[in-house]
From Swiss-Prot:
Summary of the knockout phenotype: Reduced fertility, premature senescence and severe dwarfism in psi2-1 psi3-1 plants due to reduced cell growth and proliferation as well as premature leaf growth arrest.
Organism of provenance: Arabidopsis thaliana (Mouse-ear cress)
Lipid attachment residues per UniProt (N-myristoyl glycine): G2
Protein name per its UniProtKB record: Protein PSK SIMULATOR 2
Cited Pfam families: DUF3475, DUF668
First-listed, main subcellular location of the protein, grouped into a coarse class: nucleus
GO-annotated cellular components: nucleus
Key word Lipid biosynthesis present: no
Gene from which the chain derives: PSI2
């Protein structure tokens, strides 16, 4: 009977399914999406012969069990109206997403347009909550702020006066770079524009990283400032006030940089201590662990407080707004001071080989500093210093050095102080250029550079001081290569004469005041014969204090001590009554040699070269 009932139920189910499919097709649906109209409860449930209700299968994979009503599935908590609301909410979310996409496209197109009103300092005060915090970019932003502060400080009135009156008219700059003042002004303007391009490039990069789309593509806005002379002029006080705020935040960020390094060291010590305790199976409540935990907690609190005060917690859009104002002010200041100079290469610069363009400025700076170090102490030098210096010389200097050294014998001999005085005439102004070049190459923009040097802005800096960063005209960057080669050649020749004179003075040879070439009738005495002569002594070369010290050392009588390796117990007497030392264990393996018959004085004469019997 149960089998018959089940068959009847199956036939009824098939008929109802076919009827529902026909209704869906008549409405225009393929069966994948059902009708959104509210259906009756009889469509979803049907009554069986036992007075119970059964649920229709809504999925093709769902199996309909033909059990009694007692074990039938529970009626659903949601009806078709809730399903309809879900479908509507899904369509609503899709519409919102499409609308947001359209808004983003319009924002991108709007940001690419350069219709920005500069009358309000580049949309001043218009910030978005989508900008986000600076967080880990704080250190890179602080490095950029340090560069901007240095550039803005170099454009102050005092530094500009120093550059125009002193630097451009300096004799040293004219010797190395050019004697044309106009060309020097063009080089100075191009340097400032290049520094500005580097600074603004980083601001553009940060703007593209901002979530607020109005700060994207800032390069087009800066190009508009160059091509179109904007009537709006940002006041100097406003730009300096914004820069002062940024410098204050950057200074706190530098403290955060150092404290984060200290926190990393504390964490490493704590982990190392924990590993040590675990390896020894000791409890974690020791005194050392507790101390490290307290230090680690205090350091974390300090780091969190600095993060709140520094660039870490600032809004990136607000920082970019201030940086854009600073870039705009620097651009208009460069135009006011230098005009159109430095915008394109000058025709007078063609044909000049500059050290900076060739990438040789740092190499020549090291050469000059090495020559200065050798000249300061020529008598105490390692053996490989001269070879290292010679190998580092340029090819043009090496080629011209050999004929110059061959003509030294015909020149007048000078003393060591005289040679040093001649070298000092060139080194006293070349060495500062070399030191500035080395300093400029050491600061190549790494993230922690600003943290190791204190950032100062607008605090009465002296003339020519640019946060410790020299300008390129104060380095070897624009120096003419043939001119520098000639100075290096002269210094190397003087250095050769200095080394030669220092060696002669060290061997006790007194230089003649006139020509050092002796007449042919006089016999030249070599240094070796002078040193081996019995009448020769070094005491006439020593001062009174050195002689007294030498006599005191020679008067000390040294007594022989007992060696533990030889096991010398004491003195023994032979048959004749002479005291002898006990022999060591190693002396028994050596053959005995009788030296009583030989004359020791003749051997010493042969060694000293005073015995002429074999000549």
């Amino acid at each position: 009977m149960g089998g018959v009932c089940s068959c009847v139920f199956k036939d009824d189910d098939k008929k109802k399914k076919l009827r529902s499919n026909d209704d869906d097709k008549s409405r225009g649906f393929s069966g994948k999406l059902k009708s959104m109209r509210r259906s009756k409860t009889s469509d979803s449930y049907y009554s069986d012969n036992y007075g119970g209700s059964r649920r229709k299968s809504s999925k093709p994979d769902e199996v309909v069990f033909n059990f009694s009503g007692e074990l039938g599935p529970m009626p659903p908590l949601r009806n078709d109206s809730t399903k309809f609301m879900q479908r509507n909410s899904f369509m609503g979310r899709a519409g919102v997403m499409g609308l947001e996409k359209a808004v983003e496209v319009l924002d991108t197109l709007g940001s690419s347009m350069t219709r920005m009103n500069p009358s309000n300092a580049y949309l001043s005060g218009v910030t978005s909550s989508r900008g986000g915090k600076v967080t880990i970019l704080a250190f890179e932003v602080a490095n950029t702020i340090a560069k901007g502060a240095a550039l803005l400080q170099s454009l102050s009135e005092e530094n500009l006066k120093f550059m125009k009156k002193d630097m451009l008219h300096s004799e040293e700059v004219k010797k190395l770079v050019s004697t044309d003042t106009t060309e020097l002004q063009i080089l100075a303007a191009s340097d400032k524009r290049e520094e500005l391009d580097l600074f603004s490039g980083e601001v553009i990069r940060f703007g593209n990283m901002c979530k607020d789309l109005q700060w994207h593509n800032l390069d087009r806005y800066f190009m508009k400032l160059d091509t179109e002379n904007s009537q709006h002029k940002l006041l100097k006080d406003d730009a300096e006030a914004r820069m002062q705020e940024l410098v204050t935040l950057a200074r706190i960020t530098s403290e955060l940089y150092h404290e984060l390094q200290a926190l990393d060291r504390f964490e490493q010590d704590y982990r190392r201590k924990l590993a040590e305790v675990e390896s020894l199976n000791l409890p974690r409540r020791g005194e050392g662990i507790v101390i490290l935990q307290n230090e680690l907690k205090q350091q974390k609190k300090l780091v969190k407080s600095l993060q709140k005060k520094s660039l870490w917690s600032q809004n990136l859009a607000e920082i970019i707004e201030k940086l854009v104002d600073v870039v705009s002010y620097i651009r208009q200041t460069i135009v006011e001071v230098f005009g159109n100079n430095g915008l394109r290469d000058n025709e007078g610069e063609q044909g000049r080989e500059r050290l900076g363009e060739a990438g040789l400025s740092l190499h020549y700076a090291n050469l000059i500093q090495q020559i200065d170090n050798i000249a300061s102490r020529p008598s105490s030098l390692p053996s490989n210093v001269r070879d290292t210096l010679y190998n580092a010389l340029p090819a043009t200097v090496k080629t011209a050095l050999r004929p110059r050294l061959q003509t030294l014998d015909q020149e007048e001999e000078l003393s060591v102080p005289e040679i040093k005085a001649e070298m000092e005439k060139s080194l006293q102004w070349l060495v500062p250029f070399a030191e500035n070049t080395t300093k400029a190459h050491q600061g190549f923009g790494w993230v922690g550079e600003w943290a190791n040097s204190r950032i100062e802005f607008g605090k009465g800096k002296g003339k020519g001081e640019n946060n410790g960063n020299p300008t390129r005209l104060q380095t070897l960057h624009h120096a003419d290569k043939p001119i520098v080669d000639s100075y290096v050649l002269e210094l190397v020749v003087w250095l050769h004469r200095l080394m030669k004179s220092s060696k002669k003075r060290a061997h006790g040879v007194k230089l003649q005041e006139t020509n050092h070439v002796s007449p042919p009738n006089n016999r030249t005495i070599s240094n070796t014969q002078l040193s081996l002569s019995p009448d020769f002594t070094y005491k006439n070369q020593l001062s009174l204090e050195d002689r007294l010290l030498l006599d005191r050392v020679q008067s000390i009588r040294f007594g022989p001590n007992l060696s533990k390796s030889q096991e010398l117990v004491g003195l023994k007497k032979n048959k004749k009554g002479f005291k002898i030392w006990a022999l060591s264990r190693s002396t028994g393996n050596s053959p005995k040699v009788d030296l009583s018959d030989k004359n020791s004085s003749s051997d010493l004469d042969v060694l000293d070269g005073l015995d002429f019997a074999f000549q």
